[in-house]
């Protein structure tokens, strides 16, 4: 049995189609001074041909998906049109007398290596995009035909080392049953595509392409993280029954998506969605989100060569406000820097980016960026229920500085007679032990907290979850992390404020009852998880889960925490 990283839930079975990536062998090639002009011309022609192809792929993608996917190719085109990128390659050809393809290979590998070394999973996965652009550009420089993947005739499970944006844009996705890849994580392109199409996917299997062959019969169970190659007839019969049951349960969950998350003894919590783009709102609505618990604005700042203007940001926030029709939207100010290095912002390279110049630290130092974003949010607040949230807070001083800047901008808009919500709520992310420990002070300064469980876990346990040697130590349900979460919730409630959570823990089925019992007021998660979490809450009793939380918080180890929760769930299931 093969497993990997669960990227998109579902169960499917069918024949394998193995996509083997062609590896281009580009060797060092010295050229004479007389050939330099011709090699530069060869590069420019190849670059222009690549841009035309990407524009065509972008147009096709807009028909298949929404702008969120076609925007990937906009970023690819922008890189190819970037003067600095072009000049680096041309300079190598001219200064070192090397062929256009070898110069291109060097620069592409430099770009990809820079991304691969980052700690941020999303940006690390963009290295595949760079390699995809490079592969296409090199083929065009060398006049090698690029194969057409649009001719899939029968339903298949696609198996690949990794799927690039340009490959998925060309594939006949109507014939795809699911995806399995050697590489990738939750934020890789394959995962994003699979979730948007609601197709089962398991990524990061390490070696599926070595184990499966074309036309092998594959069972892909991305609920239980199991892949089976050429199973027995008995296994096929079992998976058919399992798939039928899963589809039936999924249908019932979707039908009940708009029911509120209210326990049997009438305790209500709010369930929201985390989004990164305007297009994500469609999924949020589809799965019954009552609010947007986290809008990650940093994606507005990425895949471009300049800062988004106040006007561009205003139009984006206004659209989201109008789309959500008076439902709450928490807009987190840009969380970039350190590992999310945006070239045009000139963020210095740091030894330890997770402890470096990032998020609100950049905003306080670069007030023109902060002011443009806050003004855009304030202006958009006239069109819906927007809330502002600041990330990476460690002190009361930071909060007061940010509140002061916000008040100045409110006065400016008031003098300019520009409408905005003067009472817009302001909250902070609790994602550092520092902010959790002084939550009782911070609760006096803001309207709400939202716990970023991913970073809070990482900082509390001093564990880089991207480091394979120690990733097993990363555990958001360790007693130390749970203790801090409870401390934060209690601090907010003591002064009549509320606490939400927008990290992965908020959408973890096993953690739901515990967090509910701890008093969490709002859960924000990936949209597809919402119906299941709502159902778990509706089937629970607040009085019982409060007792569970009290018991769990007394446990000294994760195993004892886990056993306590499992025992509670098993007893509850028997009593249903």
UniProtKB/Swiss-Prot annotation:
Q: Which catalysed reactions does the entry list for this protein?
A: L-histidyl-[protein] + phosphoenolpyruvate = N(pros)-phospho-L-histidyl-[protein] + pyruvate
Q: Where in the cell is it found?
A: Cytoplasm
Q: GO terms for molecular function, please? A: kinase activity; metal ion binding; phosphoenolpyruvate-protein phosphotransferase activity
Read off the Pfam families from this record: PEP-utilisers_N (PF05524), PEP-utilizers (PF00391), PEP-utilizers_C (PF02896)
What are the binding positions for Mg(2+) in this chain?
431, 455
According to its UniProt entry, the protein's GO biological process terms are: phosphoenolpyruvate-dependent sugar phosphotransferase system
Tell me which Gene3D superfamilies the record gives: Phosphoenolpyruvate-binding domains (3.20.20.60), Phosphohistidine domain (3.50.30.10), PtsI, HPr-binding domain (1.10.274.10)
Q: Enumerate the InterPro entries for this protein.
A: PEP-util_enz_mobile_dom, PEP-utilizing_PTS_enzyme, PEP_util_AS, PEP_util_C, PEP_util_CS, Phosphohistidine_dom_sf, PTS_EI, PTS_EI-like
EC number(s) on record?
2.7.3.9
Disulfide bond residue pairs: none
Q: What does the entry's domain section say?
A: The N-terminal domain contains the HPr binding site, the central domain the pyrophosphate/phosphate carrier histidine, and the C-terminal domain the pyruvate binding site.
- Give the multimer and partner information: Homodimer.
- Tell me which PANTHER family the record gives: PHOSPHOENOLPYRUVATE-PROTEIN PHOSPHOTRANSFERASE
Descriptive protein name: Phosphoenolpyruvate-protein phosphotransferase
Species for this entry: Buchnera aphidicola subsp. Baizongia pistaciae (strain Bp)
Q: Which gene encodes it?
A: ptsI
């Amino acid at each position: 049995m093969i497993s990997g990283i669960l990227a998109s839930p579902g169960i499917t079975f069918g024949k394998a189609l193995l996509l083997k990536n062609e590896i281009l062998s580009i060797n060092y090639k010295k050229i004479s001074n007389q050939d330099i002009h011709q090699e530069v011309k060869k590069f420019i022609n190849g670059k222009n041909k690549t841009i035309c192809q990407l524009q065509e792929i972008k147009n096709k993608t807009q028909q298949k998906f929404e702008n969120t996917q076609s925007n990937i190719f906009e970023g690819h085109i922008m890189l190819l049109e970037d003067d600095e990128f072009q000049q680096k390659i041309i300079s190598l050809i001219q200064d070192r007398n090397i062929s256009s393809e070898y110069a291109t290979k060097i620069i592409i590998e430099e770009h990809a290596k820079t991304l691969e070394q980052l700690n941020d999973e999303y940006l690390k996965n963009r290295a595949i995009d760079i390699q995809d652009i490079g592969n296409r550009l090199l083929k065009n420089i060398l006049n090698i035909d690029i194969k057409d993947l649009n001719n899939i005739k029968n339903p298949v499970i696609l198996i690949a080392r990794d799927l690039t944006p340009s490959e998925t844009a060309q594939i006949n996705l109507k014939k795809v049953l699911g995806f399995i890849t050697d590489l990738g994580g939750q934020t890789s392109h394959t995962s994003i595509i699979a979730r948007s199409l609601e197709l089962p996917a398991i990524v990061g299997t390490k070696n599926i392409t070595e184990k499966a062959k074309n036309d092998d019969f594959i069972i892909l169970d991305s609920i239980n993280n199991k892949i089976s190659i050429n199973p027995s007839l008995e296994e096929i019969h079992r998976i058919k029954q399992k798939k039928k049951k899963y589809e039936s349960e999924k249908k019932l969950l979707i039908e009940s998506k708009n029911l509120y998350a209210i326990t049997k003894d009438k305790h209500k919590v709010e369930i929201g969605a985390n989004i990164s783009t305007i297009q994500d709102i469609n999924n949020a609505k589809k799965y019954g989100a009552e609010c947007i618990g986290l809008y990650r604005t940093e994606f507005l700042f990425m895949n471009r060569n300049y800062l988004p203007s106040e006007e561009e940001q205003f139009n984006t926030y206004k659209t989201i406000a109008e789309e959500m029709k008076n439902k709450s939207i928490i807009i987190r100010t840009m969380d970039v820097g350190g590992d999310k290095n945006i070239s045009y912002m000139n963020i210095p390279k740091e030894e330890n980016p997770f402890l470096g110049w990032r998020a609100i630290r950049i905003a306080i130092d670069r007030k023109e960026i902060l002011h443009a974003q806050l003004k855009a949010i304030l202006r958009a607040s006239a069109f819906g229920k927007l809330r502002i949230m600041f990330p990476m807070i460690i002190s009361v001083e930071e909060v007061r500085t940010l509140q002061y800047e916000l008040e100045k901008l409110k006065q400016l808009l008031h003098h300019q007679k520009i409408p905005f919500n003067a009472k817009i709520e302001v909250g902070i992310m609790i994602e550092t032990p520092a902010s959790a420990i002084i939550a009782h002070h911070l609760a006096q300064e803001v309207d709400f907290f939202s716990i970023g469980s991913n970073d809070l876990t990482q900082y509390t346990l001093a564990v880089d979850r991207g480091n394979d040697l120690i990733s097993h130590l990363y555990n958001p349900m360790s007693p130390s992390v749970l203790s801090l979460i409870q401390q934060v919730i209690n601090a907010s409630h003591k002064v009549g404020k509320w606490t939400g959570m927008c990290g992965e823990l908020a959408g973890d089925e096993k953690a739901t009852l515990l967090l509910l019992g701890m008093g969490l007021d709002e859960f924000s998660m990936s949209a597809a998880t919402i119906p299941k979490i709502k159902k778990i809450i509706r089937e629970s009793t607040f009085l019982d889960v409060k007792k569970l939380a009290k018991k769990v918080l007394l446990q000294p180890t994760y195993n004892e925490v886990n056993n306590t929760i499992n025992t509670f769930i098993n007893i509850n299931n028997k009593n249903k």
